[in-house]
Amino acid sequence: MEEIIAPISKEILKAELSEDKRLRFTNKSHNEIYVITYQDSPNVMKEIGRLREIAFRAAGGGTGKAMDIDEYDVMENPYKQLVVWNPEAEEILGGYRYLLGDEVQFDEHGKPVLATAHMFNFSEVFLKEYLPYTVELGRSFVTLEYQSTRAGSKGLFALDNLWDGLGALTVIKPNVKYFFGKMTMYPSYHRQGRDMILYFLNKHFGDKDKLITPMKPLEIETDKKMLENLFCYDSFKEDYKILNTEVRKLGYNIPPLVNAYMSLSPTMRMFGTAINYGFGDVEETGILIAVNEILEDKRVRHIESFVKQHPEAMKITSGAHPILTK
């Protein structure tokens, strides 16, 4: 386990987070969202790598390296980094990395060069009919200090701020129809609790079309009959109440990101779970969300609020910076 690098100076970060890289202001907490790449903001990338590694290690994952930066962050056509910046404290409070499906490269075997390609198989239908209109999301994190209730409203709305950034992407890139990403659970999470969550997700969101499948699917260890009897309702809401109660009985909560994704869209697709062996053996569940099926209250908050801030984005995309509009 390597020692994590020292923080990057605030002055250096501010110099790289120039106005042309700012995507929008957040709805809550008066934070700012930027989109950068390793090539145009190498020091911000280092700070992201530092904060990611701290957050993931604390949860039981991470790379074990001095910072979490991999080949997908630094390749020729790299993943873009969406970060939330707190201008008062002059620090990053969270982020995502993403790649637009129409920019995905393919290797000599015809496999997409995606960060999830070592864990999931992609069907021809997905590659042809979905991928060109999809944004792949990954490495979602909230800085450790902002995960605490001590952070007050800044911490409370960190995840909400990240959704604001994703909402803006759907406006600036109108051909984006889907978000593909992963819900991460850690090996330290209670096994029976994990099995309940995965069974519940598969029952209510399981993909019947096999668009994407895990190469080595994670098997549920808990007795299936017991889970079947436990989650006995057709209704998502009734089964969810049971899930929440049973997980709490074990002394755990449903992970915040799992809750957040479930509350985004009733038609989310779940593709099964794979173990990410190079990243602390975390358990990654693949999901797909259709932008036009995001629930109205979320759409108004994260997407339509951006249109109000940037009406020009609906006519031409000049309101966004060059990384997004190239």
From Swiss-Prot:
Belongs to the acetyltransferase family. It comes from Phocaeicola vulgatus (strain ATCC 8482 / DSM 1447 / JCM 5826 / CCUG 4940 / NBRC 14291 / NCTC 11154) (Bacteroides vulgatus). Keywords: Acyltransferase, Lipid biosynthesis, Lipid metabolism, Transferase. It holds the Pfam family Acetyltransf_5. It catalyses: a (3R)-hydroxyacyl-[ACP] + glycine = a lyso-glycine lipid + holo-[ACP] + H(+); (3R)-hydroxyhexadecanoyl-[ACP] + glycine = N-[(3R)-3-hydroxyhexadecanoyl]-glycine + holo-[ACP] + H(+). SUPFAM superfamilies: Acyl-CoA N-acyltransferases (Nat) (SSF55729). Its EC number is 2.3.2.-. Is involved in the production of glycine lipids (GL), which are phosphorus-free membrane lipids. Catalyzes the first step of GL biosynthesis, i.e. the N-acylation of glycine via addition of a 3-hydroxy fatty acyl group, to form a range of monoacylated glycine (also named lyso-glycine lipids or lyso-GL). As an example, catalyzes the production of commendamide, an N-acylated (3-OH C16:0) derivative of glycine with hemolytic activity and the ability to solubilize cholesterol micelles; this compound can also activate NF-kB through the G-protein coupled receptor GPCR G2A/132. Pathway: Lipid metabolism. The keyword Acyltransferase applies. This is Glycine N(alpha)-acyltransferase. GO terms for biological process: lipid metabolic process. InterPro entries: Acyl_CoA_acyltransferase, Ornithine_N-alpha-AT. PANTHER family: GCN5-RELATED N-ACETYLTRANSFERASE, L-ORNITHINE N(ALPHA)-ACYLTRANSFERASE. It is an enzyme of class 2 (transferase). One of its GO terms (molecular function) is acyltransferase activity.
